[in-house]
């Protein structure tokens, strides 16, 4: 009986520490911008999963490589303007009724791991909209307390905060200048 009790105690302790480790490195960002256009007009631009290059200044090109329209499971290939690196992302959920999409990183050069992003367009009245863009991820070297240069929390946060802020500003400009 003592052997079983020891086994259960070890299993509980091991599980608890694994769960604590899994949550320890999560980083979150949230950005929002108000746009002088109805939500449906904003969604027509922002909700085109394969067309992010039309409004994101950091994206040189983007194309769907799996599925030819906005649907769950679609894969897009992005080419970054700054350094020409490629990133592949997958559309996890696409809800045009609520003007919401969720996507994740699949492959390529990225400065975070376990990346998941959600973009939502909301009507706020008087022909205006609010776009909310949130991301959840971990720094690249999440398993160590001493990550190499460029793989720490600050590097991941700086890169993705910059991408979201410039992306939202680009979306506002693209929609309002139509």
Question: Could you say what each language-model-derived stretch is?
Answer:
Residues 8-11, 20:
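Cleavable N-terminal signal peptides
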Residues 15-17:
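N-terminal signal peptide c-region/cleavage motif recognized by signal peptidases
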Residues 38-39, 45-48, 87, 156, ...:
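Stable alpha-helical elements in mature extracytoplasmic
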Residues 54, 63-111, 122, 166, ...:
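Glycine-rich portal/gate segments that line the openings of hydrophobic small-molecule binding cavities
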Residues 1-9:
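Bacterial N-terminal signal peptides that target proteins for export
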Residues 25, 111-118:
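Amphipathic hydrophobic-ligand
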Residues 130, 137-178:
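A conserved amphipathic terminal alpha-helix motif
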Residues 20-68:
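Hydrophobic ligand-binding cavity/cleft-lining segments
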């Amino acid at each position: 009986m003592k052997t079983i009790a020891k086994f259960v105690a070890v299993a509980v302790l091991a599980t608890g520490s694994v769960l604590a480790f899994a949550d320890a490195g999560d980083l979150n960002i949230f950005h929002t911008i108000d746009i002088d256009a109805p939500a449906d007009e904003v969604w027509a631009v922002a909700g085109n999963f394969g067309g992010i290059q039309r409004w994101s200044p950091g994206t040189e090109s983007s194309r769907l490589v799996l599925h030819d329209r906005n649907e769950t499971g679609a894969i897009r290939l992005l080419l970054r303007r700054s350094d020409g690196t490629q990133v592949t992302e997958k559309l996890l959920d696409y809800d045009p009724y609520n003007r919401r999409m969720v996507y994740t990183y699949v492959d390529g050069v990225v400065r975070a791991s376990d990346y998941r992003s959600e973009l939502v367009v909301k009507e706020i009245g008087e022909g205006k909209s609010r776009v909310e863009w949130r991301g959840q991820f971990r720094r690249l070297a999440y398993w160590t307390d001493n990550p190499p240069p460029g793989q720490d929390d600050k590097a991941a946060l700086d890169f993705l905060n910059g991408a979201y802020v410039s992306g939202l500003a680009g979306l506002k400009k693209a929609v309002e200048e139509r």
